[in-house]
Curated annotation (Swiss-Prot):
Gene: ribH
Molecular function in Gene Ontology: 6,7-dimethyl-8-ribityllumazine synthase activity
EC number: 2.5.1.78
Active site, per annotation: 98 (proton donor)
Domain of life where this protein originates: Bacteria
GO cellular-component term (any): riboflavin synthase complex
NCBIfam families: lumazine-synth
Binding site for 5-amino-6-(D-ribitylamino)uracil: 31, 65-67, 90-92, 123
GO process annotations (BP): riboflavin biosynthetic process
Family per similarity comment: Belongs to the DMRL synthase family.
Pathway assigned to this chain's UniProt record: Cofactor biosynthesis; riboflavin biosynthesis; riboflavin from 2-hydroxy-3-oxobutyl phosphate and 5-amino-6-(D-ribitylamino)uracil: step 1/2
Pfam families xrefs: DMRL_synthase
Protein name per its UniProtKB record: 6,7-dimethyl-8-ribityllumazine synthase
Function: Catalyzes the formation of 6,7-dimethyl-8-ribityllumazine by condensation of 5-amino-6-(D-ribitylamino)uracil with 3,4-dihydroxy-2-butanone 4-phosphate. This is the penultimate step in the biosynthesis of riboflavin.
Amino acid sequence: MATEGNNLSQYDKNTIPNAKDFRFGIVVSEWNEEITEGLFQGAFDAWIENGVQKENIVRWNVPGSFELIYGCKKMQQSFEMLDAIVAVGNVIQGETKHFDFVCDGVTQGIKDLNVQTDIPVIFCVLTDNNIEQSRARSGGKHGNKGTEAAIAAIKMAQLRKDAKFYKG
């Protein structure tokens, strides 16, 4: 396993753009709440640590990971001033093909939002084989994918800002 023994949430703060003026949205699935709350906390803490003001973070909840697509789309439409959105979910492999359908649908839906709209949506959906893997990646021994998603959101917000500058 590529992540075995590694905490993937370590980053060099000096390589992160100044985020004090950025505004972020985060849409969180209520399914597997233990995991998604850990991911949310990782993202929130990373934003605060990098200068984002609490009042510049908007959170919405949706029932499950499949609903993240609609939640992110509506957040884009409702808060056009947002610089990026993070979609937080967790799908754990079961005995049926439901896992595959949900994972494929969410992945394609988030991709479509990125292609069709101007506010970047960061994919922070854990797709693990079991709950232990999810725990390890939501604040456990492998770090917190929520932290990584927040850093990606900051970098994409900066890219979006830079692209607008060059466009004129």
